[in-house]
Amino acid sequence: MSMVDTAPGKIQVRDLNFYYGKFHALKNINLDIAKNQVTAFIGPSGCGKSTLLRTFNKMYSLYPEQRAEGEIILDGENILTQAQDIALLRAKVGMVFQKPTPFPMSIYDNIAFGVRLFEKLSRADMDERVQWALTKAALWNETKDKLHQSGYSLSGGQQQRLCIARGIAIRPEVLLLDEPCSALDPISTGRIEELITELKQDYTVVIVTHNMQQAARCSDHTAFMYLGELIEFSDTDALFTRPAKKQTEDYITGRYG
């Protein structure tokens, strides 16, 4: 395993192990996620990349049989401790899932929903926040005249951008994207990829993808995982052109996975 030469990381993972019951899903993971960069996790199905992503906002805490051991340091604090406030963590670390998941409410309320949980804004300030989030997600021009229509009225690609807008509306520091383009057509995928590149100006972005070309296009750093282990972690260009490990080379050249 090699670590990217960035110090200190926005997220620092130290000796992380994760278990689904007795199944050891992540094994001694160590890496630093660089601030205001895009980091991609790649690897075959079941390698642990989505599991690792979900430890960053403790999504596993919903399931008592799942547990993490080790440290994940965010802004100097280990988020894996029992003292960690889950709601505040998820305000700081936003997440967008594989399939678009708009709430059953208007486009406007999809954006405003999370904001209302953490802030008391005037109507004018909320209007401004909704416009800001939709603009950041490259969706404002397509929705500004139909904000009170259902989020379900949007196309699949628009719904995913709505979910990204919803995620950034509460102004997190980190944005997690779990296969955000897997259910989208190539045109919508292209727009999401452009958006990911733009978002790193304001956020630390971590993306899980099966699409190695997507990782190569969008990310600054890439981690290759296999069977719960971090095999290699490097600058994206270096990992794809000069992999240090044979397992990495075999995967990116299609020899297995």
From Swiss-Prot:
Enzyme nomenclature, EC number: 7.3.2.1
Pfam family, one: ABC_tran
Keyword field: ATP-binding, Cell inner membrane, Cell membrane, Membrane, Nucleotide-binding, Phosphate transport, Translocase, Transport
Highest rank taxon of the organism: Bacteria
SUPFAM superfamilies membership: P-loop containing nucleoside triphosphate hydrolases
InterPro entries documented for this protein: AAA+_ATPase, ABC_transporter-like_ATP-bd, ABC_transporter-like_CS, P-loop_NTPase, PstB-like
A GO BP entry: phosphate ion transmembrane transport
Coiled coil spans: none
Major location (coarse): membrane
GO CC aspect terms: plasma membrane
Residue ranges annotated for the ABC transporter domain, each copy included: 11-252
Location of this chain's protein in the cell: Cell inner membrane
Membrane topology note: Peripheral membrane protein
Residues annotated to bind ATP: G43, P44, S45, G46, C47, G48, K49, S50
Oligomer and partners: The complex is composed of two ATP-binding proteins (PstB), two transmembrane proteins (PstC and PstA) and a solute-binding protein (PstS).
Function: Part of the ABC transporter complex PstSACB involved in phosphate import. Responsible for energy coupling to the transport system.
UniProt xrefs under NCBIfam families: 3a0107s01c2
Family, as annotated: Belongs to the ABC transporter superfamily. Phosphate importer (TC 3.A.1.7) family.
The name this protein goes by in its record: Phosphate import ATP-binding protein PstB
Naturally occurring in which organism (per UniProt): Enterobacter cloacae
Gene giving rise to this polypeptide: pstB
